[in-house]
Amino acid sequence: GEVPADSFQERAAPYWPWATREYVIMDGALPLNPLTLNPPFPCTRSGFFKVTFLVALKAGKDSGEFFDCWLNEHVPNVRNTMEAVGGFRYVVSHSLDPSSETYAGMAELYFPDPSGWDRYRDHIEPDGMKNFVDYDNTDVFYTGTEMVGIEAP
């Protein structure tokens, strides 16, 4: 680790660089919720719910076969499910050196709200990823974000 340069880095420690290749599978529009009791500008609001998977590879598994399964089998499965339940963004990142990294990859799924994630879990079909993923060492983060845009006068 490096010495933190600011308070954010201090609280986000430990930080480590991670070289990945990103695949933007779905890049839909962020849902905007217009204001109802006053004029829409100079302020707009939007929000979303995001699920992030830091995916660990099972010991002894070939990362090339894993990435092939992820892109050619799992991605279509997730994309179809995301489209069916109203998800609007799906991004996959693969480690450039999975043999020396804690995680082989990362997946980010974006929904307008947490109910989209609930519907996703009810609809996703199992696929070949189960043969590669070390679920005990995979981490999952759930985040809600609200953004307020204020137009300068």
Where are these regions (language model features)?
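Macromolecular interaction modules
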Residues: 1-153
